[in-house]
């Protein structure tokens, strides 16, 4: 019996073999089962907790008739500018049906959204090129680790991919329909509304609607040389209805925009286009800020993480579909535009991007459709059995790598890198691995089981580099604290769970991480992605606390005890050096800083400390070199800019000093020390400019 979606999406011709339709249905059903079962081991993704908390606020806003406006108070997360309707709908269901296992249900809902996205992509391929292309679309998704990995727990980007793909599909069908009726207009309105309701970028679909309609009307005019005023009025009425209807429906579950229907949406788009939160991540072997990455960050990450079989299909599409382009050029042209335009736009805008290309998962379904059509055309082009067998064998070889990665490394599917980087092992230390913290779940569950076995009932403090309270919610004797891994010596903890996320590539490549006191290491393809660390001594924390409480002599005792042992934490040496420096022991300070650099030669605080000591001694040349090193490692280490600029001013390099300060103020316009020094640089040469900077400094906190 054919699935019910067929009557909605397409009408299969009588000539299509039942066995082909049956295979399509079977593959789609198997994918659904696989994806739903795959959520059982899914971790909580990096942004999931904060989005869930925001969805609870959205629920409370509507449950109180708008009286509870805490949903609008998001100074850090900025989530009031984010529609996140899928999160909101999921939380509504959680509340209505009193679901206790919140995150499991969220992951199941997300897997369903991911499967629907795959299904619609396959149906789009069927509409464009037949069942063969549709089946290949399903198969390509089955070996797409990045998409399948995010389909486990990414309730931001997977639902948006579903909405964007649905909007694209229904828009194309509406544009090329013989008659535009409610039957093809309503799905278009609903899909655009769904896309807008998730994030402001959904507005793209309305832009496509207007642009593609204008192109078709212009094409009709060129062919007929006539303008039908009545028809144009009807088209304008239909467009207005679609735009208004989809927009109004799209903001129903978005409190901020619902209260400010025009200005709220414009502000949301502005914030999301240049998202203010920036993070450091590994790219090409070095840590770099997300808003300072090279322009090719996005295309390169897509190139090295999308399976080569998909890229082979894309190349085949452009090489072999000339006839299809001649017959359906506009359809394919519009589809390709929906892929390329968002990518080109963010490259042009130099938008703030991080977390690999997960924010652009929404273009992947259309890429897979083109790849599937390309592979289908490749198989059709070469009908000779031996040649076709060779092609199939080649495709199976290309599919082998991503497929076996999925089998070996589930639930860490999204960590996949293709053969261009040498796989995950080749990417290790050069690109981020578990950037969405999926492995924290396995680490937490292992530690809970181990403590119940070996330390039942003990009150212990657990540290993590990602909020993990949910996994420990039933363990009343275990207190969980979040802190960055690099700051671990400054916190009180007994065990620490650390995902391989945003850790210095120097520590990774030199095998300083995972540390030697790890009691459990979780791996994917032979590389560590999470470590459970047991603290051997709290002398580092006690020494730090003593110094903070102004007891340097006591602090020294703790640190002396610690550094006698093998130590892999460079910050301990930095903190110990700070104590010695405060006590006037410069020689020991320098010695400790050097030992810290033996662990991590690129430790910015230590290099900065060394530079300050050299500047204090008057060795300005060496100090300047170290300041430049710090800036080279971290372009947002703002304290280094005025420090280096002062040396430049002393050495009469005023132009260089001002360039440094301008660079600093471009990234942080409110950095007062740089403003004051800029004023000083003009104090003699241009008192009026100096006065303006002085005024700016007074206005800056």
Task: Give residue ranges: language-model regions.
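Short helix- or helix-capping micro-motifs
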Residues: 137-142, 149, 169, 192, ...
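Signature aromatic-anchored transmembrane alpha helix within multi-pass, membrane-resident enzymes
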Residues: 25-29, 190, 207-211, 239-244, ...
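Perimembrane helix-loop-helix junctions
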Residues: 5-7, 170-184, 192, 205-247, ...
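C-terminal luminal/periplasmic domains and tails of membrane-associated envelope-modifying transferases
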Residues: 3, 424-701
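Transmembrane-helix motifs of polytopic, lipid-linked glycan transferases
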Residues: 108-128, 166, 170
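Transmembrane-helix signature of polytopic, membrane-embedded enzymes
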Residues: 25-26, 121-143, 162, 180-183, ...
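Membrane-lumen/periplasm interface segments of specific transmembrane helices
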Residues: 237-274, 303, 397-413
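Hydrophobic, aromatic-rich transmembrane alpha-helices
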Residues: 300-328, 483
């Amino acid at each position: 019996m054919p699935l019910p979606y067929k009557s909605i999406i397409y009408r299969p011709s009588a000539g299509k073999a039942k066995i082909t339709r049956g295979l399509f249905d079977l593959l789609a059903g198997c994918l659904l089962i696989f994806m739903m079962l795959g959520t059982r081991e899914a971790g909580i993704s990096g942004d999931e907790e904060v989005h869930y908390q925001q969805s609870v606020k959205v629920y409370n806003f509507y449950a109180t008739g708008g009286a509870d406006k805490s949903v609008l108070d998001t100074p850090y997360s900025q989530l009031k500018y984010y529609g996140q309707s899928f999160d909101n709908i999921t939380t509504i269901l959680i509340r209505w049906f009193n679901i206790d296992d919140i995150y499991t249900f969220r992951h199941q809902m997300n897997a369903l959204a991911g499967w629907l996205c795959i299904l619609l992509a396959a149906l789009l391929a069927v509409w464009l090129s037949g069942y063969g292309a549709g089946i290949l679309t399903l198969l390509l998704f089955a070996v797409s680790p990045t998409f399948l990995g995010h389909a486990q727990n990414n309730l931001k980007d997977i639902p948006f991919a579903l909405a964007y793909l649905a909007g694209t599909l229904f828009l194309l069908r509406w544009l090329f329909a013989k008659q535009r009726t409610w039957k093809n207009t309503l799905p278009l309105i609903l899909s655009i509304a769904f896309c807008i309701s998730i994030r402001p970028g959904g507005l793209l679909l309305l832009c496509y609607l207007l642009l593609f309609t204008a192109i078709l009307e212009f094409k009709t005019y060129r062919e007929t040389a006539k303008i039908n005023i009545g028809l144009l009025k009807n088209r304008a009425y239909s467009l207005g209805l679609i735009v208004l209807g989809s927009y109004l429906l799209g903001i129903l579950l978005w409190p901020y925009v619902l209260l400010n229907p025009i200005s709220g949406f414009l502000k949301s788009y502005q914030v999301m286009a240049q998202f203010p939160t920036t993070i450091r991540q590994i790219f090409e072997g070095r840590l770099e800020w997300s808003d300072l990455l090279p322009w090719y960050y996005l295309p390169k990450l897509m190139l090295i993480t999308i399976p080569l079989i998909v890229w082979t299909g894309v190349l085949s599409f452009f090489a072999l579909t000339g006839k299809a382009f001649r017959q359906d050029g506009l359809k394919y042209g519009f589809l390709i535009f929906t892929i390329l335009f968002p990518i080109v736009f963010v490259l042009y805008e130099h938008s703030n991007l991080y977390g690999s290309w997960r924010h652009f998962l929404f273009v992947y379904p259309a890429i897979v459709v083109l790849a599937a059509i390309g592979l289908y055309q490749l198989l059709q082009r070469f009908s000779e059995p031996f040649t076709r067998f060779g092609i199939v064998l080649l495709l199976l070889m290309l599919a082998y790598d991503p497929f076996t990665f999925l089998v070996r490394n589930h639930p860490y599917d999204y960590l996949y890198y293709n053969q261009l980087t040498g796989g995950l092992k080749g990417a290790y230390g050069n690109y981020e691995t578990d950037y969405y913290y999926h492995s924290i779940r396995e680490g937490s569950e292992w530690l809970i089981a181990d403590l119940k076995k070996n330390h039942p009932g003990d009150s212990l403090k657990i540290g993590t580099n990602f909020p993990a309270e949910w996994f420990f919610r039933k363990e009343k004797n275990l207190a969980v604290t979040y802190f960055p891994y690099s700051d671990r010596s400054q916190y009180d903890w007994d065990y620490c769970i650390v995902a391989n996320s945003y850790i210095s590539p120097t520590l990774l490549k030199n095998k300083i991480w995972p540390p030697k006191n790890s009691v459990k290491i979780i791996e994917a393809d032979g590389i560590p992605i999470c470590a459970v660390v047991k603290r051997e001594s709290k002398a580092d924390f006690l020494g730090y606390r003593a110094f903070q409480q102004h007891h340097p002599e006591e602090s020294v005792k703790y640190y002396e005890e610690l550094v006698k042992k093998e130590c892999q934490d460079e910050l301990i040496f930095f903190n110990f050096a700070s104590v010695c420096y405060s006590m006037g022991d410069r020689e020991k300070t320098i010695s400790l800083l050097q030992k810290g650099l033996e662990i991590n030669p690129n430790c910015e605080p230590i290099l900065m400390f060394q530079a300050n000591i050299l500047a204090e001694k008057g060795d300005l040349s060496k100090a300047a070199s170290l300041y430049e090193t710090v800036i080279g490692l971290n372009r947002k280490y703002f304290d280094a800019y005025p420090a280096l600029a002062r040396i430049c001013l002393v050495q009469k390099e005023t132009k260089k000093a001002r360039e440094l300060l301008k660079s600093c103020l471009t990234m942080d316009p409110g950095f007062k020390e740089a403003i004051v020094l800029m004023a000083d640089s003009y104090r003699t040469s241009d008192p009026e400019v100096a006065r303006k900077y002085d005024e700016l400094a007074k206005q800056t906190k």
